[in-house]
Amino acid sequence: RLVAKGFLERYDNGIYYIPKAGGLLGKSYLDPLLVIMRKYVRNKYETYGYITGLSFVNQLGLTTQMPAVIEIVTNTEATNGRTVMVGSQKVRIKKSAVPVSNNNVELLQLLDCIVQAEKYTELSLKETVDTMLSYVRQKRFTKEQLSEVSYAINGATAKKLIEWGIIYEFRS
């Protein structure tokens, strides 16, 4: 009824918003990225997912490529992977192997990125490793944080953590 009266606008299934009177276009519209972040990544109080894949590799500066499909790992997904449309944006959602929280989200993002970095990077291996090392130093990850998610680390990730020297940057 509120949609019919014009108080609310329907964005997508189960997603409604209060439109603001805009300038040239009349009404305001929701940014698909904001809807994606709220639905699959975090709200005001908690974090329950993270962006991974080419999007995160781009955020780190390892590539200039922009993905057509945003990959997200989230606690709110029950399947091992599916693709959905949020507005005009395609999103690939995957279930998290480790429950994502405010405490471990950046570390889980890094661990996913380590495996994907060589596939997507436009930099040399040395520049890629240096970028990853500076990210670890900037975030000041601890060995305790790493041990809390260690059961989800696969062999390829563990190998690169050691070979690239990233594991030695974790603080005691």
Predicted features by range, described:
Residues L30-D31, E46-I51, N104:
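Alpha-helix initiation and capping sites
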Residues F7, T64, R137-R140:
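Short alpha-helix boundary/capping elements
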Residues R1-Y40:
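Short beta-edge/loop segments at beta->alpha junctions of small alpha/beta modules
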Residues L24-S28, R82-T83, V136, R140:
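Alpha-helix boundary/capping detector
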Residues Y17, V73, R92-K94:
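Residues in well-ordered beta-strands of folded domains
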Residues M85-K95:
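A short, charged helix-loop
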Residues K94-S172:
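Hydrophobic alpha-helical interaction segments
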Residues Y11-I15, R42-N80, M85:
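Short gly/ser-rich loop at a beta-strand->alpha-helix junction or flexible surface loop bordering the NTP-binding
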